[in-house]
Curated annotation (Swiss-Prot):
Top-level lineage group: Eukaryota
Keywords: Leucine-rich repeat, Repeat
LRR repeat extents: 117-141, 143-165, 190-213, 228-251, 290-313, 421-443
Signal peptide: none
Protein name from the UniProt record: Putative F-box/LRR-repeat protein At3g44810
Keyword Methyltransferase among record annotations: no
PANTHER family registered for this protein in UniProt: (RAPE) HYPOTHETICAL PROTEIN, RNI-LIKE SUPERFAMILY PROTEIN
Residues annotated as domain F-box: 6-54
SUPFAM superfamilies: F-box domain, L domain-like
Amino acid sequence: MSSVSTASLNCLPDELLVHVLSSLETKQAASTSVLSKRWRTLFAVRRNLDFDDSIISHPEVGEQNMDDVQESFRDFVDKRLAFQGSVPINKFSLIYGDKHDDVRVDRWINTALEHGVSELHLCLTSVTRRLHRFPSNVFRSTTLVKLTLGTNLFIVYFPSDTCLPVLKILVLDSIWFDRIKFSNVLLAGCPALEDLTIDQKSFPGLPNVVSSKTVKSLSIVYKYSADFDWFRTVALDTPNLVTLLYSTYARHRYRHCNLESLVNATLDLHFLENCDEAFEPNVTDLMIAVRNVQMLHLTSSATEVISQCCKGGLPMFKNLLVLVFLGNTERVWKVFLPLLLEHSPNLTKLCLESLFLILQGLYHGTDEDEFDEIHIPRSNKVNMLRIIQCQGTENELKHISHFLLKMECLQLVQVNFSETIVDSKKVQLTEDLMKLPSASSRLTMQVI
């Protein structure tokens, strides 16, 4: 920093200079303290602290030097927290790898809690955490509003007196925890919780019961197939839930699903692979639980699972207004989509994503001149149709034409071409689409 720019910044009032320093990472802000005593004092006023040891982990640093570098990092964190004095901490973020002292890390966390931290983000990876209890004070904080815990972190137990009275957002990223006490201890101790994320793509630790009367947004991503015993049943008791992202393996039974307030659901269901035991999923109760949604997004794997495993029959979706549908098998395209349309009498917006892949599956090994139209209920109320990733094949155009003739309420059709299509072909395809006949006299065609 030049002397001119330093002098210019020194003219700023304390409040504005503190704002400038707060926009820098903690280590960058610390380096400015050598410029003047005033800056050193203002640096201590920072209320957002972030420490990340990944910025010191460079390949060119040898193994012998790495211990010294990490010790230097630990000393920096110690000194910075000691420098905080009585100034409150709003946000504390710590990203720290394997080779660390759990006792010292616990002290850092407790220091942040003692300073009334409202946002705590911890990304700790440590094999020693398997035998070390996580600081229990984290689960007794009266100031935490947002808590993020990760990754590959082991939490041996939740304190019986867990109480996070103002916590609104909880994110668990690859965390091992006591699944039995997850709802009746942890969630029960979060009376203000509104947003819950459980992301366990490659790590065990998914509760088979999620129960909360306050959670409005729930995201569950779980792809750890080795944890088989916990896949037989699941319960989602969240009566005030509004938004759900559910990406995991289909279960044998959904024994209690209370989702009566749900408005928006994204389902990404998968078949359990490489399973030695007989395992037959049944998603009937799950589909019944989400039947009142207004917006439904189904991935290609979800449509496959539901088409085969909704053994009690598909419920009516009387409130469904928006449907995003993916699929790539003949059964899904010819049987499940028409059935879902019939069971969605008030649907107004339909989005078909990667239609080319769907048609590849449908027409694989058949004569492309043979057009097998998809049944569209005559009573459909769809007024907006969106086709995403259109490749402009002949069969795609035939199906789009079929939709235009069968959806009499259509007002808007949006066709998003694939990025792989050259501009000259886009021009020709746009002309072809504009010439397609329609049953609706109020139709507008948009090509993107």
